[in-house]
Amino acid sequence: MTGWLIDMVSVGQRKPFLLQPFRGATRHLRRVSVGGLRRLQYTSLLLTRSYWGLMYAFNWWDIIDEHFVLGGAMMFDDLDRLQGLGVDAVLNLCAERSDNRHQLDNAGIAYLWLPVIDVCPPTLDQIMQGIGWIEQQLRANRTIYIHCAVGVGRSATLLACWLLYAKRMNVAQALRFLKTRRPQVGLTRLQVRRLEEFEGWLRTGRDNGIARVAGH
């Protein structure tokens, strides 16, 4: 018992032996906490998915056009089903969870993770990186699944930014277009404001940064 309370002398240095089990316990608690949080997030997504499907007949994802599918976080056999739609690239905007990179690599799926906190917009740098990556995938003739947790805010914001950039839509046109394809799209005020900022930024002709990322 006293061995836990005294300092041990090793190679001329005094090391508090009591810290060793404490550090081990801290690491264990951290692993348990992260695992519990992931299970809670998964349960929350499952409930949201079930609620939308039963109450509103909303889809977990919707085909936007021949290049894009917009939706929520992947669960169950979603990857197989999305591949059946021709999806071979995934862009994830969830800060709270990454996708299974090992599974995606094995399936030959191109992947980009841009972590954005829920209800917040992506940063300008993330928008530039995301659009540049999208342009690369389109040149490779890939179909892209863009998602966040439930596919209504963060992912829709980035796809709307691409519509502003590539299709020269304005903010109202981009949001109206997305809503016709996916009715539950609903951006927060912060996300709409970022769209407006990006639209103004494009008007200044500073989109050459995106071209550099895209490799044009």
Give each language-model segment a name.
Residues 1-53, 212-216:
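Non-catalytic regulatory/accessory regions that flank a structured catalytic core
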Residues 13, 22, 29-30, 141, ...:
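Short, intrinsically disordered low-complexity segments
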Residues 54-144, 164-197, 203:
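Cysteine-based protein phosphatase catalytic domain of the PTP/DSP
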Residues 141-160:
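A phosphate-binding catalytic loop at a beta-strand-loop-alpha-helix junction
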Residues 200-216:
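C-terminal domain-closing interface element
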